[in-house]
Structure formats: structure tokens, C-alpha cells
A protein has these predicted regions:
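Structural motif at transmembrane-helix junctions in multi-pass transporters
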Residues: 40-45, 88-105, 121-123, 175-182, ...
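Hydrophobic alpha-helical transmembrane segments in multi-pass integral membrane proteins
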Residues: 57-67, 113-127, 163-179, 225-242, ...
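Membrane-interface interhelical linkers
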Residues: 2-80, 86-96, 137, 144-157, ...
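Hydrophobic/small/kink-forming positions within alpha-helical transmembrane segments
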Residues: 26-30, 79, 83-87, 107-114, ...
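Hydrophobic transmembrane alpha-helices of multi-pass small-molecule transport proteins
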Residues: 51-57, 111-117, 124-144, 271-290
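Alpha-helical transmembrane segments of compact multi-pass small-molecule transporters, enriched
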Residues: 52-56, 104-118, 133, 190-194, ...
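Hydrophobic/aromatic positions within or immediately flanking transmembrane alpha-helices
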Residues: 22, 46-47, 75, 102-103, ...
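C-terminal appended segment following the main domain
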Residues: 228, 232-294
Length: 300
């Protein structure tokens, strides 16, 4: 079976390398989101974090090739989607807590991604689809707050739609490029530059520069975390099912819930603990039984 544009469609089980990469990316993703939420101005802080990622990528740019022509439609499309994603995410963090916004935004996409990638010809084992559904349920149980501001919930759901869209595009683009790390580096240079230009035009370059002088540590920590995490996910998606990788990455809500509880005063209820454990149980169902090198050996 082949996916979009004649690309091979990875099948279950997920390689262990992809699992490790996705789980590491989950921790890194929760960290940079906590930095954005924990600052004084989520929009400015997100610009600094993504600008920091762009700076890291810019240093690496001379050592990677320009993405092939087949990858550029996906690269430009995901770049376009990341602009409203960033603006919506910053607005959501202004309206609600880290635990609630992050959970709703990251808990909703996995099943949407699974359905979208199935339509493109990428399939998982039935138990893995069940695992993705369990992850989504656990994520939503971890942080969904029925009495949270309606604006925060609505914005988080809009963020979720952009996440589902760019995740599918990321997987297709990484495979089309043949060089997922190079693809990620080019993406971060363009994305960070574009988003900082938007924020600079909106708030003014002097205001952004002043904010950066007093909050540069967020860029120094969050920038590399974001770039490395995204690169790991793209690398994993280049040879493993997009739906499975995305679902495992969303277990980051357990990390975000802990950060919100430990450092931001978010409550840690029994429901959230049970939801986190449910999400981890779903992750176990998505995980593989064989490492990648054994799968390759059996295909030869």
C-alpha cells in the first residue's frame, strides 16, 4: 500500500526508535509551552521561543541541503498553518490555565489525525487505533475543566484543528523531503522569522526588542527545546505512522499537568491523575514489539 504522491505508507508496529523520539519530544514540547504560559505576555514569549528555534536552525542551515521540490508544497502549507496556530495558542494561554488549554489543544487532534492518515492510505493495527482513542480520552480527562472560561476552551479547540492539519502535512513533507532533519531546519528558519515579523508588526519592533532584553532566557531554553522536539517528531514521522507518532507525542499533557501543578498553581485532582494514567496506558497499546532494525532485516 502506498500513501500520498506514491509515498510508502508505513504500517504497524511502531518502531521503538519512533516511540523514544516521540516521548522525548513530548517532554520538550511541554517545557516550551510552559515557558510561554509562564511569562508575562504569551504572544511575545511565543515569538521569543520560536525566534530562538529559528536562531538554532540558522546555525545548522549551512550543513543541510535545500528541501527537494516535492517537499516545498507541504513545507509552505505547514508554515502557513503555523501562523494562526501561534496566534491562537497565545490567545488561549491568555484566557486559560496551562493544564486546561494544553490538554484540550493536544487531546483533541490524535483521533482526527488517525482518520486523516487512514484516508491517505496509512493504517495501524486495530489495537493501536484503540490505544490512540484511549490516549485522547485520558488527555481530555487530565485537564478538561467544565467550569473553565468558554473563551479558553473555544480557542484551545481551534488550536487543536490547526495541530491536526499541520501534523498530517508534517508527516507527508518529511517523507517527501527524504531528509527530515533538513526539512525541520528549513521550516524553523522560515517559521520563526515569519512569526517574529508578524509580532513585530503588531506590537512594534521596539516593544519586541525591549521585551527580548529582559526575557531572553525563554528563547535560550525554549528555542532549542522546540527545535529539537519538532525535529525528533519529523524524523519519527518519516518512517513511522503519523497517527501513532502524534498520539505518543501528545502524552506531553502529563508533563504539562505536572508543571502546571508544581510551578503554576494548577490543581492536581484525582481525575487528572487517573486521566494521565489512562493516557499512558493508551501509549502502551500504540507502542511496538520490534525495533526498526529487525523490521528492516525482515523486509530484505
Amino acid at each position: 500500500m502506498r500513501g500520498d504522491a506514491g509515498l510508502p505508507a508505513p504500517r504497524a508496529p511502531l518502531p521503538i526508535e519512533a516511540v523514544i523520539a516521540a516521548l522525548a519530544a513530548a517532554v520538550l514540547h511541554a517545557v516550551w509551552n510552559a515557558l510561554v504560559k509562564g511569562g508575562g505576555d504569551p504572544l511575545m514569549d511565543l515569538a521569543l521561543v520560536w525566534g530562538g528555534s529559528a536562531a538554532v536552525a540558522l546555525v545548522c542551515l549551512p550543513f543541510v541541503a535545500v528541501p527537494v521540490a516535492a517537499a516545498w508544497p507541504y513545507l509552505l502549507a505547514t508554515l502557513f498553518i503555523h501562523m494562526p496556530y501561534g496566534l491562537l495558542l497565545a490567545a488561549a494561554y491568555r484566557a486559560g490555565s496551562l493544564s486546561h488549554v494544553y490538554t484540550v489543544a493536544r487531546g483533541s487532534p490524535p483521533m482526527l489525525i488517525a482518520l486523516a492518515t487512514a484516508a491517505l492510505g496509512e493504517t495501524l493495527a486495530p489495537g493501536q487505533y484503540l490505544g490512540i482513542a484511549v490516549i485522547s480520552a485520558g488527555i481530555l480527562a487530565t485537564g478538561f475543566a467544565p467550569h473553565a472560561p468558554a473563551r479558553a476552551t473555544l480557542l484551545a479547540l481551534c488550536v487543536a484543528l490547526t495541530i491536526a492539519a499541520y501534523s498530517v502535512l508534517d508527516g507527508l513533507g518529511a517523507r517527501a523531503s527524504g531528509e527530515p532533519i533538513g526539512y525541520a531546519i528549513w521550516f524553523f528558519v522560515l517559521m520563526g522569522g515569519c512569526f517574529m515579523a508578524i509580532v513585530s508588526a503588531w506590537r512594534g519592533p521596539a516593544a519586541l526588542a525591549l521585551y527580548a532584553r529582559t526575557n531572553w532566557r525563554r528563547a535560550a531554553v525554549g528555542g532549542p527545546a522546540g527545535a529539537l522536539g519538532y525535529g525528533l517528531v519529523l524524523w519519527a514521522m518519516s518512517f513511522a505512522p503519523v497517527a501513532g507518532v502524534s498520539a505518543l507525542r501528545e502524552t506531553s499533557v502529563a508533563v504539562a499537568a505536572f508543571i502546571g501543578w508544581a510551578f503554576m498553581g494548577d490543581p492536581m485532582s484525582k481525575r487528572r491523575i487517573a486521566g494521565a494514567l489512562l493516557g499512558l496506558a493508551g501509549a502502551e497499546a500504540v507502542k511496538p514489539a520490534r525495533p526498526l532494525h529487525r523490521q528492516i532485516a525482515q523486509q530484505r
